[in-house]
């Protein structure tokens, strides 16, 4: 079976266009390929604002502040482990890797702070989130 990832992107903030969605999908596919993910998988993305990510952070992690990106991996992996096709949802044939939530307000603020483009900052946050699905590390460090 050919590798085909499913990457739905929901935006509850204005100004997110199809070009940005395509860019995010490309970054995710590239990061997963670099990590050796060679099976069809699903990654769900929510693009939101500081207020919403603050509430999600509080509800899910009991951290009372906004942040740039949140990652919710589907699997609790050990170093060197990857989920595999045996973990696929029987209904879709896709391995659900997890969810990522990105504050577009933080993207803009951090891009300005670090002196680079919003696009570069968005790519950085997307890759950072993807690595938590494939390279286990402490999940509450960021």
Where on the chain are the PLM-derived regions?
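An acidic/histidine-cluster motif and surrounding catalytic segment
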Residues: 1-122, 135
């Amino acid at each position: 079976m050919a590798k085909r990832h499913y990457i739905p992107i929901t935006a509850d903030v204005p100004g997110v266009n199809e070009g940005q969605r395509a860019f995010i999908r490309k970054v995710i596919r590239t990061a997963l390929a670099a990590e050796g993910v060679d099976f069809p998988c699903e990654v769900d993305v929510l693009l939101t604002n500081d207020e919403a990510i603050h509430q999600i952070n509080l509800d899910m992690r009991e951290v009372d502040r906004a942040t740039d990106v949140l990652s919710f991996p589907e699997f609790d992996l050990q170093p060197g482990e990857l989920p595999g096709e045996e973990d696929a949802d029987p209904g879709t044939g896709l391995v659900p890797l997890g969810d990522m939530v990105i504050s577009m307000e933080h993207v803009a603020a951090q891009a300005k702070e670090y002196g680079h483009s919003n696009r570069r900052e968005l790519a950085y946050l997307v890759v950072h989130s993807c690595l938590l699905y494939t390279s286990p590390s402490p999940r509450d460090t960021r």
